[in-house]
UniProtKB/Swiss-Prot annotation:
<protein>
    <recommendedName>
        <fullName>Crossover junction endodeoxyribonuclease RuvC</fullName>
        <ecNumber>3.1.21.10</ecNumber>
    </recommendedName>
</protein>
<comment type="function">
    <text>The RuvA-RuvB-RuvC complex processes Holliday junction (HJ) DNA during genetic recombination and DNA repair. Endonuclease that resolves HJ intermediates. Cleaves cruciform DNA by making single-stranded nicks across the HJ at symmetrical positions within the homologous arms, yielding a 5'-phosphate and a 3'-hydroxyl group; requires a central core of homology in the junction. The consensus cleavage sequence is 5'-(A/T)TT(C/G)-3'. Cleavage occurs on the 3'-side of the TT dinucleotide at the point of strand exchange.</text>
</comment>
<feature type="binding site">
    <location>
        <position position="143"/>
    </location>
    <ligand>
        <name>Mg(2+) 1</name>
    </ligand>
</feature>
<dbReference type="InterPro" id="IPR036397">
    <property type="entry name" value="RNaseH_sf"/>
</dbReference>
<keyword id="KW-0479">Metal-binding</keyword>
<keyword id="KW-0460">Magnesium</keyword>
<feature type="active site">
    <location>
        <position position="11"/>
    </location>
</feature>
<dbReference type="GO" id="GO:0008821">
    <property type="term" value="F:crossover junction DNA endonuclease activity"/>
</dbReference>
<keyword id="KW-0540">Nuclease</keyword>
<dbReference type="GO" id="GO:0006281">
    <property type="term" value="P:DNA repair"/>
</dbReference>
<dbReference type="InterPro" id="IPR002176">
    <property type="entry name" value="X-over_junc_endoDNase_RuvC"/>
</dbReference>
<dbReference type="InterPro" id="IPR020563">
    <property type="entry name" value="X-over_junc_endoDNase_Mg_BS"/>
</dbReference>
<dbReference type="Pfam" id="PF02075">
    <property type="entry name" value="RuvC"/>
</dbReference>
<comment type="similarity">
    <text>Belongs to the RuvC family.</text>
</comment>
<keyword id="KW-0234">DNA repair</keyword>
<dbReference type="GO" id="GO:0005737">
    <property type="term" value="C:cytoplasm"/>
</dbReference>
<feature type="active site">
    <location>
        <position position="71"/>
    </location>
</feature>
Amino acid sequence: MPIRARIIGIDPGLRFTGFGIIEADGNRLRHVADGVIATDGAAAVAERLHTLDAALARLLATYAPDHAAVEETYVNRNATATLKLGYARGVALLAPARAGIAVAEYGAKTVKRAVVGTGAAEKDQVALMVRRLLPGAAITRADAADALAVAICHAHHLATASRVPAA
């Protein structure tokens, strides 16, 4: 059975969180919205997380997605930066779950493989393929392109799961 779903993809970050909303109808994908949620870098971490949570709640209420997909956190050498990214990711996971929306998680290589065909793709290759898969989308920020890629990855996984018979 072909899938029909509205999906929000989220690329979490404490300073900038990208979001992308698509509709999947069978093999066709349609761009709905995308953008970036920015927090004040001078504000306390708790205030920034509150800003992120409130913005995600508004997006979820406005666009009413059926599914959410969040990119997994990569660990870098700066432990403090990794922890802060983890805080933002926690909010990105909690907001849709609190709204009763199923949340999937995908690593960067899985997203790249689903969108470009290789897990070693560069960011500009991912953005180019997102634009090809979503014609007419005027994507202006890399974070938004990444979030749309996460949503596309989830759409592909939903489509595959719908074709595989249950055991």
